[in-house]
A protein has these predicted regions:
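Glycine-biased, small-residue-rich flexible motifs in mid-sequence functional cores and linkers
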Residues: 2-284
Length: 284
């Protein structure tokens, strides 16, 4: 069920009120109290490289170790990796949506969105039924930065939408961190430019959380448990450089619906990547 907090409500998120002059009603599903906890935004390109995905996952896991909430936008690429790694390590995450919280977008993240609703927080300025439009993404980025104590741009090309998040954060007086990338890679032009222009180069994740005054908690990071069939599928994927779902199904000898479900589960657990029908092992 979707809840709404009007602008004049005394429970309206203080972080948003302090950062934005044009704040609007907030629609949400999940645990609104997560907004009161220390948090970092982890954002970046939809077309992320294996390096970017690995960095996003490692940073999200580190956030869990320090008891910080992970904030992102539920988009493909860096956002998905951050949410997924946080969930798999038993952390708490907030997804700020460019559509209504009842709308599944992107469709590939439907299972993840449901899980965030159950264990974290879905947040949006848009009422139920609103579909994502080109203009709603940059608008929601100012919410991502507003509710976060620090913003990390993991990987971004020269025209990545995550650069808008960085700009919003700077306008709000938030610290922006950027992970350095290969200077010859188009996918790192944006992050490297941010560093050139004054963003903090993030080369040690612990330093970020120490900057926020956080200490590592005693929380044990969740172990990843697999069913017998999940383990079999993972071993098959490990044995080949890049396999189609049909090839895996043929080797394991199970029906298509079951293999698709297992592929989704393993991808949610951050163990594999599935793109364009091809499955490969994750770079952790």
């Amino acid at each position: 069920m979707t809840n709404v907090i009007e602008e004049k409500n005394e429970n309206y998120p203080i972080k948003i009120k302090e950062c934005l002059s044009d704040y609007k009603p907030i629609y949400y599903r999940g645990n609104l109290s997560l907004l009161d906890k220390p948090s970092i935004a982890i954002v970046g390109s939809r077309k992320a490289s294996s390096y970017g995905k690995s960095c996003a996952r490692a940073l999200a896991k580190c956030a869990v170790e320090y008891g910080a909430v992970v904030v992102s936008g539920l988009a493909l690429g860096i956002d998905s990796e951050a949410h997924s790694a946080c969930l798999e390590n038993g952390g708490e995450t907030i997804a700020v949506l460019a559509n209504g919280v009842d709308v599944f977008y992107p469709k590939r993240n439907q299972a993840m969105q449901k899980r965030i609703e159950e264990t974290g927080l879905l947040l949006s300025e848009y009422e139920d039924g609103t579909r994502a439009q080109r203009y709603t993404f940059p608008v929601r980025n100012r919410i991502i930065s507003a509710i976060s104590d620090a913003i990390v741009i993991v990987e971004a090309g020269s025209r990545s939408g995550s650069l808008i998040t960085a700009e919003c954060a700077q306008e709000q007086g938030k610290e922006v961190y950027s992970i350095p990338g290969n200077i010859t890679s188009p996918g790192s032009l944006g992050t490297n430019k941010l560093i050139r222009d004054g963003a903090v180069p993030l080369i040690n994740f612990d330093e970020l959380f120490e900057d926020l005054g956080l200490s590592k908690t005693n929380k044990k990071i969740n172990q990843i448990f697999l069913s017998k069939t999940e383990s079999r599928v993972l071993e098959v994927v490990k044995s080949g450089s890049e396999l189609s779902i049909e090839q895996i199904r043929h080797i394991i000898d199970i029906d298509l619906a079951e293999i698709n479900a297992i592929i989704t589960i393993l991808e949610m657990k951050g163990l594999i990547f599935c793109e364009m029908g091809k499955v490969s092992i994750a770079n952790l």
